[in-house]
Structures are given as C-alpha cells and as structure tokens.
C-alpha cells in the first residue's frame, strides 16, 4: 500500500474481530471484514486486498489517480465493503467524480441502499468525499 492512511482508515471503518460475528445483514464476518484469525493474518489480508483495489482503480479509472488521499480512501472503503460490482452501481456518483463535482458525488452516494443500510458510515464517508 502506498501509505498507512488508507489502511488505518479501512481498519477504523471495518473494526477488528478475532472471531466471526453476524453482521447487520446476517453475514458471518471476521478480521477486518473477513472466522477465527489472528490480527497479523487479518492485517496481511487487509493490506493485500486494499492494494489490489487501489491497483485496479488506478488501472481502470483515470479520475481515481487525481483524487487526494482522503477521497481515494473513501472509494477504496466502498469497494472493500460492497465489492467492485456493488461500487459500480453508483453510476451517478462515479459520473460526478469524473467531473470533479464532489458535492454531487456525495449527494449521490447518500441517495442509495448502501446509505440506508449503513447510515453512519455513509454520512461519514460522503462528508469526507465532499471535503477531500
């Protein structure tokens, strides 16, 4: 990973659990969003997954390269939580990001099922996306 800010941001957003638990959608979750795992293993998995997401975004979305670290952290967090296919459903938000209209991108991010399912996270992240 290029720096620890994004890693630390995802760690704060996901939280660490050494044993599996049932999340709000009924999914068994562990580690940093991964059932029994050491913290070191979870951190290795997290770093690898975040690097993969970052590399994919750099290779496939020109606008992502020009985002500051805070905005990249939000995008990586969304892809990490929702998967790439889930993130790509945010067509209007992505279009606003391409235009560097971060206010509109945040509005579109909040107008979603994701924001209804994880409202505190969505509000926090869309504020960060808007502010940069």
Q: Model-derived features: where do they sit?
A:
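Long, amphipathic alpha-helical surface segments
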Residues: 1-19, 25, 34-37, 41-58, ...
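Mid-chain, well-packed structural core segment of small domains
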Residues: 64-91
């Amino acid at each position: 990973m290029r720096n620890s800010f994004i890693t630390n941001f995802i760690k704060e957003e996901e939280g660490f659990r050494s044993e599996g638990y049932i999340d709000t959608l009924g999914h068994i979750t562990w580690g940093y969003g991964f059932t029994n795992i050491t913290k070191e293993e979870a951190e290795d998995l997290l770093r690898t997954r975040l690097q993969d997401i970052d590399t994919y975004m750099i290779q496939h979305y020109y606008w992502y390269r020009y985002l500051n670290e805070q905005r990249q952290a939000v995008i990586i967090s969304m892809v990490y939580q929702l998967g790439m296919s889930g993130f790509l459903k945010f067509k209007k938000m992505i279009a606003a990001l391409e235009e560097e209209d971060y206010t509109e991108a945040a509005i579109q991010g909040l107008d979603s099922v994701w924001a209804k399912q994880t409202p505190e996270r969505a509000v926090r992240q869309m504020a960060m996306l808007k502010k940069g």
